[in-house]
Amino acid sequence: MKKITVLHLDDCPYCHNAKRAVEELKAENLEYAKLDIEWIEESRQPELAKPYGKDYYYVPSIFIDGQKVYEAHPGESYEECLAAVEKAFKVACS
């Protein structure tokens, strides 16, 4: 399986949606439950977030093997987030 990295902020509502989507998808799918996800809180772990800095603006952003596969956008619904996280999981499992 491929390495998944999620850049997020603790107080970001879109990041809470992404965490909820991850939990929901992992509970529904055994293959997704096996995925190892590195969560980087960019305000507390700037040294870990820095290598990704030029590749994203909004959080949450999901990277698979260093390539951005998802970046939230203002006004995004939970359903959009869920679909994007599931798409990222499918890429990670392929």
Where are these regions (language model features)?
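Local sequence-structure signature of Cys/Sec-based thiol-disulfide redox active-site neighborhoods
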Residues: 1-28
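Extracytoplasmic thiol/disulfide redox context detector
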Residues: 1-5, 30-36, 93
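Hydrophobic beta-strand residues in large extracellular and virion-surface proteins
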Residues: 4-6, 37, 62-64, 85
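Short alpha-helical
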Residues: 13, 44, 76
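Non-catalytic interaction surface on structured domains
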Residues: 18-22, 30, 64, 78-79
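Thiol-based oxidoreductase modules, predominantly thioredoxin-like and allied folds used
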Residues: 32-47
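Charged, often glycine-rich, active-site loop that binds/positions anionic groups
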Residues: 49-55
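Non-catalytic, surface beta->alpha helical segment in thiol-disulfide oxidoreductase systems
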Residues: 58, 64-94
